[in-house]
Amino acid sequence: MFGIGMPEMLIILVIILIIFGAGKLPEIGGAIGKGIKNFKKASNESEEIDENSRPKKIEPK
């Protein structure tokens, strides 16, 4: 995962814990989760728009 192993992830987590404190972590996690959910929803909607905007083939008579 981007060359980041478990020890590096733990160090990053400890630094975040020190900066924001234990009380803010659930708030931050919820905000990140909502952001990811909205991003996925928007990307799925753009795929649906692309499929609907394709011109339909008209067959000659």
From Swiss-Prot:
It comes from the Bacteria. InterPro entries: TatA/B/E (IPR003369), TatA/E (IPR006312). The keyword Transport applies. Pfam families: TatA_B_E (PF02416). GO terms for molecular function: protein transmembrane transporter activity. Gene3D superfamilies: 1.20.5.3310. The gene is tatA. Its main location: membrane. This is Sec-independent protein translocase protein TatA. Keywords: Cell inner membrane, Cell membrane, Membrane, Protein transport, Translocation, Transmembrane, Transmembrane helix, Transport. It is found in: Cell inner membrane. The Tat system comprises two distinct complexes: a TatABC complex, containing multiple copies of TatA, TatB and TatC subunits, and a separate TatA complex, containing only TatA subunits. Substrates initially bind to the TatABC complex, which probably triggers association of the separate TatA complex to form the active translocon. GO terms for cellular component: TAT protein transport complex. It is a single-pass membrane protein. Belongs to the TatA/E family. GO terms for biological process: protein transport by the Tat complex. It comes from Syntrophus aciditrophicus (strain SB). The chain crosses the membrane at residues 1-21. Part of the twin-arginine translocation (Tat) system that transports large folded proteins containing a characteristic twin-arginine motif in their signal peptide across membranes. TatA could form the protein-conducting channel of the Tat system.
